[in-house]
């Protein structure tokens, strides 16, 4: 084989290899994107199941953090749009950690751990009866949850009486793909969930 023939053969090999890579690379990206989308759906399902199940079993909720560490009520904070404390047989606070994009789970004592990663939005809205228990539910204006009148709950914590009327929570959750390079291929996943407090006095 002459030098010219060798150069031509090398050029053809490079072109063929480039063509193969041009086909294989997008296919690999699609496969990775499909895997990441499946992972995102699983994370979303896990978050949705945990949040809705805990709210449904709750006696009441608080729109702020409660516990031995960084208790919002003790700091005079009685509303956070991205936080809910669920009170039942146990007390658990769920909140969005904005700087790390994580859904956090706090047990009210010393355990404060991430539950779901790559959460880009988490908000809680509340519904309560218009008057007596059993009447139509309406969205609760956050301002009414911090303006009193005030009472004490069973744990002797100060609480707005309107908070005790909450009998349904609307949860808005949005997750993103884990790999930044795949986010153009994998759209964020959104869900809005409604969970009624089955053990609330106002739900009876």
PLM feature spans:
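Surface-exposed loop/linker segments characteristic of extracytoplasmic
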Residues: 45, 67-131, 188, 192-196
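Alpha-helix initiation/capping motif
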Residues: 33, 37-40, 108, 112, ...
């Amino acid at each position: 084989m002459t030098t010219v023939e060798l150069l031509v053969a090398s050029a053809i090999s490079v072109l063929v290899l480039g063509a193969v890579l041009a086909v294989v690379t997008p296919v690999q990206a699609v496969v990775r994107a499909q895997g990441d989308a499946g992972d995102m759906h699983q994370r979303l399902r896990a978050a949705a199941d945990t949040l809705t199940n805990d709210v449904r079993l709750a006696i009441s909720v608080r729109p702020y953090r409660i516990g031995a560490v960084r208790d919002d009520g003790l700091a005079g904070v009685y509303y956070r749009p991205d936080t809910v404390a669920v009170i039942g047989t146990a007390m658990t606070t769920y909140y969005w950690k904005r700087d790390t994009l994580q859904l956090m789970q706090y047990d009210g004592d010393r355990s404060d751990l991430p539950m779901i990663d790559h959460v880009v939005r988490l908000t809680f809205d509340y519904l309560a009866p218009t008057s007596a228990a059993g009447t139509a539910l309406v969205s609760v204006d956050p301002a009414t949850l911090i303006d009193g009148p005030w009472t004490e709950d069973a744990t002797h914590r100060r609480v707005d009486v309107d908070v005790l009327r909450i009998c349904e929570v609307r949860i808005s959750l949005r997750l993103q793909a884990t790999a930044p390079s795949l986010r153009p291929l994998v759209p964020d996943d959104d869900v809005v969930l409604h969970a009624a407090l089955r053990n609330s006095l106002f739900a009876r």
